[in-house]
C-alpha cells in the first residue's frame, strides 16, 4: 500500500471555532448529483465556521482532475453545475484532498489535480475523522 500518513495537514490552523467537519465522497461522474450534494454540504459546513475537508476517493478523484468537469459534465437547465458547486466550496475555504492510493491506481499525479486540491494518504483521513465533530459520506 502506498499510503504514508502525511499528518502535516493536522497542524494547519483551524477556523476560529476549532471545529472540524469531514465529508467523504466516493461518487464521481457516474453519479453527478451525489458529487454536487457533497460539495453543497461541504460549503454549508464551511459557512457554519467548521474547518471543512472534502476527502475524495475512488470515482470522486476523477472529478478533481484538471479539465475533467468541462469534458464530462453536461449542464442541465436550472441545475447548478459541478464547477459552480466546486467554486462555491473553494471560495468558502473548503479543503479538498484526494486519496493517494486512488491517484496511483489511476496514474493521476498531483500536477493533474485542480489548483488547490491536495493529495492525502488514507491514514490522514482516519486521523481527521477521529477528531471531527461530524462527517458525511457521498
Feature annotation, model-predicted:
Residues 137-138:
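Aromatic- and Gly/Pro-rich donor/ligand-binding loops
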Residues 35-50, 54:
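Histidine-anchored nucleotide/phosphate-binding helix
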Residues 88-89, 97, 106, 110, ...:
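A short aromatic-anchored loop/beta-hairpin motif
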Residues 2-17:
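Positively charged, low-complexity intrinsically disordered leader regions
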Residues 60-73:
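N-terminal beta-loop-helix "entrance" segment that forms/cooperates
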Residues 16-17, 23-36:
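Short, glycine-rich nucleotide/cofactor-binding loops
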Residues 52-57, 96-100:
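Short internal beta-strands
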Residues 71-102:
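A glycine-rich helix N-cap at a beta->alpha junction
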